[in-house]
Amino acid sequence: MSLNMFWFLPTHGDGHYLGTEEGSRPVDHGYLQQIAQAADRLGYTGVLIPTGRSCEDAWLVAASMIPVTQRLKFLVALRPSVTSPTVAARQAATLDRLSNGRALFNLVTGSDPQELAGDGVFLDHSERYEASAEFTQVWRRLLLGETVNFNGKHIHVRGAKLLFPPIQQPYPPLYFGGSSDVAQELAAEQVDLYLTWGEPPELVKEKIEQVRAKAAAHGHKIRFGIRLHVIVRETNDEAWQAAERLISHLDDETIAKAQAAFARTDSVGQQRMAALHNGKRDNLEISPNLWAGVGLVRGGAGTALVGDGPTVAARINEYAALGIDSFVLSGYPHLEEAYRVGELLFPHLDVAIPEIPQPQPLNPQGEAVANDFIPRKVAQS
């Protein structure tokens, strides 16, 4: 099975070390462009663009990278409860059209009540997933070309429709990650690819089996992906030294503050990440070559595969054997590590190198009439 390898645009900051200003660098448009172009040339399928108040806006960043890349896809966040599904569907179709079919979407419900309140969202965990399920139903139906009337608990639309369809049919793929039962149920019913953070293989296997069974109950087939950091070097010793350097400027106070911030979230996935290290620096290798040091201060994906190219490739193939076909990777700093992964890891894997897409013809059309419909040629009698 050929593997889809993704990289990451660090719109929330980048540098050589975690938890310190030492070794950091400005993340401006030029730097993000360098990373995107490197990923494009090295054969990554796409890049994940993060979302949240600590990040630059993912949609604007993605749009700005379209003209400087050729085949790279952009995995951009959909935010239920923050954006209406109709507006989000229009944005999705436009990004897909402008990128010539290179748009992918990642459903993000949010997990930090404090940040969500700042965005005007006051739903609890269960309510957010209810709203996300309704949002996704409407969003997908609009991209399928339907005129949608929907009266749910959280979402209400009447006569919603798109005038401009996406390039990818029936619609651009939808990704989603969540570890709670309600999150898995949403994934099983409505998304195309379920993402998990990088837990040990036995825990990932358990998740995949649960989601696959729930999807089968809905008559739905689903793909799987995993989000991991990577520290790959020419030798295993060099890789482990690099891992230790990454957290060499971390002090106990910074770790404690970070863990306290993570504790206020209601994300089951974040709780599972934190349980892998319990905020302590000892015993960070939680599974062969799987290191939890990143999660001491970084929210979300907090584990890294560490080793030389063949070793990391063997661990990736272990995950692939569980049914995972997409790997969303990152490393610090992201420009240099994009090359290291491409040069030291890719030769040991069956990587699906994307082709440059051919321009897709768009139907000629006149200006929309009354902002309501596209004029069609009148049949001759």
Swiss-Prot record:
Give UniProt keywords alphabetically.
Flavoprotein, FMN, Monooxygenase, Oxidoreductase
Instruction: Fetch the CDD domains from UniProt.
Output: Alkanesulfonate_monoxygenase
Recorded catalytic reaction(s): these are: an alkanesulfonate + FMNH2 + O2 = an aldehyde + FMN + sulfite + H2O + 2 H(+)
Q: Has keyword Flavoprotein? A: yes
Report the InterPro entries cross-referenced here.
Alkanesulphonate_mOase_FMN-dep (IPR019911), Luciferase-like_dom (IPR011251), Luciferase-like_sf (IPR036661), SsuD_RutA_monooxygenase (IPR050172)
What does the annotation say about its assembly with partners?
Answer: Homotetramer.
Family of this protein: Belongs to the SsuD family.
What this protein is called in its record is: Alkanesulfonate monooxygenase
Gene for this chain = ssuD
